[in-house]
Amino acid sequence: MTESSDEEISSLYIHLYFDEDVSAGIVESLRTRGFDVLSARDADALGKSDDEQMLYAVSQHRAVVTHNRVDFEKQHRKFLERGMKHYGVIVAKRRRDVEVISKLLALLDAVTAEEMQNQLRYI
């Protein structure tokens, strides 16, 4: 059995970037559970375009979590059409925070960071 590096272990878990439309309560709930989360507010990226948000998430090796289905479906397609890699887009239907958290936790439990690459998932 070989030893895994911290980087290999951390790559098993999806690192999340929440755009500004997602509730701060959702971000904090996942953060207190020990997940690696970053919000647009944390990144001083409030008011940035969807292109800028997506590029920032990619630069940080993070999957985007958003309620903005239409625009981030376009971002996903654009990346694929250009042969560019992204770390995933998770579109969360607008619902109570506790429901979004539950859906995110189920996804995080079932999907690795590697499996999430270039994927568009709906919760």
Question: Each predicted region: which residue ranges?
Answer:
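Acidic, PIN/NYN-like endoribonuclease modules and their adjacent C-terminal/linker elements
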Residues: T2-S11, H15-E20, A24, S29-T32, ...
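Conserved BB-loop
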Residues: D36-K48
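Acidic, metal-binding active-site segment of PIN/NYN-like and related structure-specific nucleases
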Residues: D50, V58, R62-Q75
